Amino acid sequence: MMMDILMYLFETYIHSDAELQVEQDELEDELLRAGFQQKDIYKALVWLEELAALQQSDEHSAISTCIASASTRIYTASEMQRLDLECRGFLLFLEQINVLTTETREMVIDRVMGLETNEFELEDLKWIILMVLFNVPGNENAYTLMEELLYTKEQGILH
């Protein structure tokens, strides 16, 4: 599954501060050896390229300047099908605590919709948010807070 590949790459190369300059062929070979399917590998690499392109494009900057900070996001039918009520509520929560801006929220939604999956849940959304925040310069504090939210939930809350 594409989401599994993205999480594998994020944990192996990005989150672990491993060497980021890996040749695509070398990366594909490693993913094949790890048991992933060629077509899923290709889709995941395209997804990552599109994330990088979003970060560099002016499209989202233009969108965010047009959206008032107090506005409410209206989701399309296809977005609501992919992002259930819990996911949409979590996105709103992250905006309210300033982890996501309107720009990064739109990037997250774009990348969620770029996934080719019928099964998507809150934990998947959290990983997508981490990937987006990691790839957008100037979001280090938001990334750290999101990382804490993700790992605190996974490890359980200590008393």
UniProtKB/Swiss-Prot annotation:
Pfam families registered for this protein in UniProt: DUF494 (PF04361)
Top-rank taxon, per record: Bacteria
Residue ranges of the TM segments: none
Database matches in InterPro entries: Smg (IPR007456)
Family: Belongs to the Smg family.
Protein name: Protein Smg homolog
Gene assigned in the entry: smg
